[in-house]
Amino acid sequence: MTFDIFPAVDLRGGRCVQLVQGVPGSEVVSLDDPLVQAVRWADMGADHLHIIDLDGAIEGTRLNAPILRRIVGELEVFVQVGGGIRSRSDVAEVLDTGVDRVILGTMALRDPPVVKELAEEYGPDRIMVALDVRDGRVTSEGWQRTLEFDAIELGIVFESFGAGSILFTNIDTEGQQRGVDPEPTRELVEAVSIPVIAAGGVSSLDDIKLLSDAGAAGAVIGTAIYTGTLNLREALELAKTL
């Protein structure tokens, strides 16, 4: 089993940003050119990227497709993309840019059977479902709406519909650089057989080890590598040993 590191490139208004718990206006990082940042992570050895269109996720306005095409065209790395993908045409448009995998959040939660249809059309490996959890409950609409479901029951449902992987985000620790709580990840991993990528609060090499020990197939790292709290090269070297 390999453990993959996904540096995060979050897009907001044409810039590369990092928010605290996904709250608009809480930027702790705001950089002019997302492509420059993506190239930087690739130059450090990253062979995976996690790109989120925050304009799409928060406001439903997907304005960053040109930036996405530039990143995909420039780099030969595995790219997964989410944020504001709310229709079949959105899925087709994003996959048409050349990305490897789309992340379905609100769309999947509104209409779970669509996951099965998309997995059959594009293949399970290209369809990831996002389970973003706050206080034990799954959220939608860019983390702004809390649902009466927990991640485990939904994870089982989406696996049965053919999702190839799950992105599990712990919003309670997202963007705070205070470390991870591996137990919710472990519980989800034990309930499903498809890969689970963990996100939220990864800020040290120990956090990466904890998530690997919990059974995660990889981790998204954002704020910590932008602020220098965590060295991406060291994280990538550690991942090779897990």
UniProtKB/Swiss-Prot annotation:
Its EC number is 5.3.1.16. It catalyses: 1-(5-phospho-beta-D-ribosyl)-5-[(5-phospho-beta-D-ribosylamino)methylideneamino]imidazole-4-carboxamide = 5-[(5-phospho-1-deoxy-D-ribulos-1-ylimino)methylamino]-1-(5-phospho-beta-D-ribosyl)imidazole-4-carboxamide. It is found in: Cytoplasm. Keywords: Amino-acid biosynthesis, Cytoplasm, Histidine biosynthesis, Isomerase. One of its GO terms (cellular component) is cytoplasm. GO terms for biological process: L-histidine biosynthetic process; L-tryptophan biosynthetic process. The active site is at D10 (proton acceptor), D132 (proton donor). It comes from the Archaea. It is an enzyme of class 5 (isomerase). Its main location: cytoplasm. Pathway: Amino-acid biosynthesis; L-histidine biosynthesis; L-histidine from 5-phospho-alpha-D-ribose 1-diphosphate: step 4/9. One of its GO terms (molecular function) is 1-(5-phosphoribosyl)-5-[(5-phosphoribosylamino)methylideneamino]imidazole-4-carboxamide isomerase activity. Belongs to the HisA/HisF family. NCBIfam families: 1-(5-phosphoribosyl)-5-[(5-phosphoribosylamino)methylideneamino]imidazole-4-carboxamide isomerase (TIGR00007), PRK13585.1 (NF010112). This is 1-(5-phosphoribosyl)-5-[(5-phosphoribosylamino)methylideneamino] imidazole-4-carboxamide isomerase.
